[in-house]
Amino acid sequence: MTSEAWTAVRLSLQVAMCAALGGLPFAIAIGYWLARGRFAGKWLVEAVVNLPLVLPPVVTGYVLLVLLAPRGPIGAVLQGWLGVKIVFTWWGAALASMVMGFPLMVRAIRLAFQAVDPRLEMAARTLGAGGAATFFTVSLPLARRGVTAGWILAFARSLGEFGATIMVAGNIEGQTRTIPLAVYTLANQPDGMGRAWPLVALSVALSCGALAISELLERRQSLHVPA
Amino acid sequence: MSLLSLQCRHRYASGFELDVSFELNHRFTSLFGPSGSGKTSVLSIIAGVFRPQQASVRLNGRRLLDTANGICVTPARRAIGLVFQDALLFPHLTVERNLQYGRRHRAAARRTVAYARVVDVLELGGLLRRYPRNLSGGERQRVALGRAVLSGPELLMMDEPLASLDDSLKGRILEYLQRMIAEWDIPTLFVTHSQAEVRRAAEWVVVLQQGRMVAEGPPDEALARPAPLAWGNSAGPVNLLRIEQVTAAEGHLAARVAGQDLFLPLGKPPAVSPSFVQFRPADVIVSRQDVSGLSVRNHLHGRVCQVAPVEGAIFVAVDIGQIVWAEVTPQAAAELQLAPGAEVVCLLKAHCLTLVS
């Protein structure tokens, strides 16, 4: 593999790691809320969370680009107050990946919380634990495998993110060119099809590995649920 | 000031209406009633995990819930221990961590019960490193008891803690429970639909039926009235007599029940006292005068205190010092003129009696 290819691999892992870690607290909060909460308009929250699953990634990327551009409603604030530029940096790639992987992460986490017997939470409360203590000592530990599985799914999804990333972060060698973008770039070159093979193989291996681990964890989770 | 006072009213979407109020002043009270009578709802309201439309709950004078004044103490701050039918141990924690859960989350001032002593009394020493999934039903229930006690509750409530256990275990868990109450003097409210459990353990019983309290009093008295027994839901009244001085005699066991002699089939005399005998009301023969020349060993003298017709049969309550229920046909009841006050003899074959301990 060329040094450009290795750079793409490093960037991909960095972007995917940040995307999955950054989305995790929000996914846990929303997943728990969706699993336990009973409120009007729950369907709307669900719809918004799941939107990136059904929208063309390029459209999601377009919306993000509009919001995050230096003159966009969010981008202007970040640029003006914090001096942070998101678009066309690897941060932009991470953010786009995070949004794309978020529905998968929320779904896995929500299912994990739904599998926790709410009466165990009730038992914790009668033993003197408050709401937060109950969550951190009972609900979250019991859902931990589902949470990890969701994290891995989002990580794997980020490794493969293309459409939204290219809109928000562009395709800049050494800065935002992740594995999918590198494969795309190579494939567009006259003799590139052959040179893309190592990256393609590596990508397949990474994705399969992540999926296998996630599947394994979810199975152990279902064994863990008390009868 | 009573230990616990409760008044609650709630109308469910299904149309079921709960309207119960009572006060508790006893160490060991049983909340008794058939399934669906509202027992669990009452516990949930006291524990604070269910909030009814209208209620007030006071524990040792402290207001826990008062819907009229918008007061509602969270379950975490009520200091009420709750033991569930299926124990509900935390599956991801060892027995030791389960036991200490309540202790860690309760204020230090409430830690009145010594951990080592609980492990001792409930004989949990060998289980501490195990996970709940590797425990038997009885062991789980013991851990659940210990966990609740260690949270330093002012009131201990149990929702059918014995219902999922087999008969031989029930007696042993009840024993642990009584040992625990004796040791730490924690007032206990015990929910059950088993008359035998009520008779054996409770000092006071509150009887619920269809969301309302229909009787309360000492078990023998409260359960002797036909209305509370919810016969539509169970097989009728249960005969459970408290017996004393069980000794092995020639060819049988001899015992005393309310000052009269009782013959039991030969077996091992029970190790625990008091013990009980159980028999079916249909096995009791009622006679207006004592008869001789019968093989029947037990002749218990008493006075009819109640006659209750139920679906083609008549249940007669005879006070022999304790209540014996006899099931007779309407014709027999008429012929013998069985009415309250009538002096009768209850004839009982020794082999119809089952020793319960």
What are these language model-derived features?
Chain A
Residues S3-W6, G61-M98, A169-E173:
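Membrane-interfacial helix termini and adjacent extracytoplasmic/periplasmic loops
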Residues M1-A19, W33-K42, Q79-G83, T185-G194:
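Periplasmic/extracellular loop-to-transmembrane helix junction in inner-membrane transport proteins
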